[in-house]
Amino acid sequence: MAILDEFDEHLALRCGRSEHTRRAYLGDLRSLLTHLEGRGSRLDQLSLPVLRSWLATAAGAGAARTTLARRISAVKAFTAWAKWRGQLAADPAARLQVPRAYRTLPAVLRQDQALQIMAAAKSGAEQGDPLALRDRLIVEMLYATGIRVSELCGLDIDDVDTRHRLVRVLGKGNKQRTAPFGVPAADALRGWLDDGRPALVTVESGPALLLGSRGRRLDVRQARTVVHQTVAVVAGAPDMGPHGLRHSAATHLLEGGADLRVVQELLGHSSLATTQLYTHVAVSRLRVVHDQAHPRA
């Protein structure tokens, strides 16, 4: 579908959308075009009733509210672009409204659970296995910095300042920021760079910081698997992936007294409202502790 390839280029070059967002949008639009074909319609016959029918089909199949909201965002971006290109006479999605997604409190680790997970990863790396050294760095760096897993996998060696314990991150919308990390993450980084990465590096590795078993840049899906498997080692810890470590890092920073705007900068949130979600997590955890510990709770 050449038109989707052109739209993908538009999203990447003119809108600065991340690869993750573009992949999700294109998947939604392929679904829409398949729906159109099933009705015997062409793209220039796309209308508001057709869009509503497509969304209703997804809702009937059990699509989550957040999925429907993303589908609407995808189609609104696409139809506005297609109208601008002259491929649509009017924008049929202009009147579609994105439903407000429910904001749920994310699952987070207790601080003692986070320490147990880091200890388990360190223990696994003590034999010097290259993949175990890498896996320790993955969980340490995600928890230490709160960066996204896509940002972690996109790091090059030169993005890490080992002397000052800083990492330069290219985030959403191609916005660059710097995140500090502590001594444990620095120790994991040193072990990986000295003993792990050299054992896996190939001509295909390039400048990538993290590598897969075949020497290529580590894939996001592989990193997710590593986190899930490492967290599962700790009894009682909630099942979570990289985003759970990001949630936990933010919550623990706030519990430790960090300023909300500092946390916003560290996480790369464009809106303070997004960061404020973590204050609700911290307060709810405070309430649990208070209820359990205070004699007059």
UniProtKB/Swiss-Prot annotation:
It holds the Pfam family Phage_integrase. Keywords: Cell cycle, Cell division, Chromosome partition, Cytoplasm, DNA integration, DNA recombination, DNA-binding. One of its GO terms (biological process) is DNA transposition. The gene is xerC. Belongs to the 'phage' integrase family. XerC subfamily. CDD domains: INT_XerDC_C. Transmembrane segments: none annotated. Site-specific tyrosine recombinase, which acts by catalyzing the cutting and rejoining of the recombining DNA molecules. The XerC-XerD complex is essential to convert dimers of the bacterial chromosome into monomers to permit their segregation at cell division. It also contributes to the segregational stability of plasmids. It comes from Mycobacterium leprae (strain TN). InterPro entries: CB, DNA_brk_join_enz, Integrase-like_cat_sf, Integrase_catalytic, Integrase_recombinase_N, Integrase_SAM-like_N, Tyrosine_recombinase_XerC/XerD, Tyrosine_recombinase_XerCD. Residues 104-291 form the Tyr recombinase domain. It is found in: Cytoplasm. One of its GO terms (molecular function) is tyrosine-based site-specific recombinase activity. Residues 1-83 form the Core-binding (CB) domain. GO terms for cellular component: cytoplasm. Forms a cyclic heterotetrameric complex composed of two molecules of XerC and two molecules of XerD. Its main location: cytoplasm. This is Tyrosine recombinase XerC. The active site is at residues 148, 172, 243, 246, 269, 278.
